[in-house]
């Protein structure tokens, strides 16, 4: 499972790096707790700060799991016994934190946020949902003509 896992992490890193570089909008998003603090959702582009955090957890955490896993798979090729012990601790701790983050991500993406599961299911989101949760992205797509003025039931292509 190590090689497919590593390939998956690399593919994810390459596919979505452009949209997941942190910016100033993300700082405001975090200050407002992603909309938990206050009455409205903070502005966000295609990926909000929470989604970017998950991306970096996958890329950096997955990279740490892969690197430490390879050290454990091929003992003593690169390191001594002390390095192997460190790799064991890093591998275990990062894997547990990774799984915890993914469980939180799965919850938010399914039952924790209305409309999120539908976006994953068919690749589109309701325009009104997009304007509420990713207002800067929705405005940009509407301005580009990707979506006409939003009817109440209108849908737009979700983040890929």
Task: Label each region the model flagged.
Residues 1-160:
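Membrane-embedded alpha-helical bundles that constitute the cytochrome b-like, heme-associated redox core
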